Amino acid sequence: MSVQVPLDELQEKSAEFGWAYLLTVRDDLRPHAVAVSPTWADGALVMTVGRGSALNATARSSITLCFPPVDTTGFSLIVDGTAAVEDDVVTLTPMAAVLHRPAT
C-alpha cells in the first residue's frame, strides 16, 4: 500500500521519522545502502556520507532515501531525488515521495 506525499508536505512528514537508509548504485550496478541522519536546508535533504556513497552519487545522481517505520505496523517514507555532491556531503533534491507498507 502506497500513499503519495506532496513535496510541499515532505519536510513536515519526514520529521515524524528519525534516520534513513541512503540508497545509491555502485559501478557494477549493485545497490549500496548506508544509514544516514539527513537534515533539511533550502528545501533539500542534506547528509554526510562516506567515500563510496559520495562516488556513487556523483556517478549516478538518482538516489533514494528510505526512512524505516517507527513501529512494525507503520509506514516507511521513501523519497526519490537527485543528488548534488560536495566532498562528503550529499544533497538530495526531492522529486517524489511515498509512504509505503505491505498490503494487508
Residue ranges and their predicted role:
Residues 1-19:
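Short, basic/aromatic recognition patches
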Residues 7, 16, 35, 57-59:
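A generic structural signal for ordered alpha-helices
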Residues 13, 29, 38, 56, ...:
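Sterically constrained small-residue positions within well-ordered secondary structures
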Residues 17-49, 78:
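Short beta-strand segments
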Residues 42, 50-104:
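Short, structured beta-strand-loop surface elements
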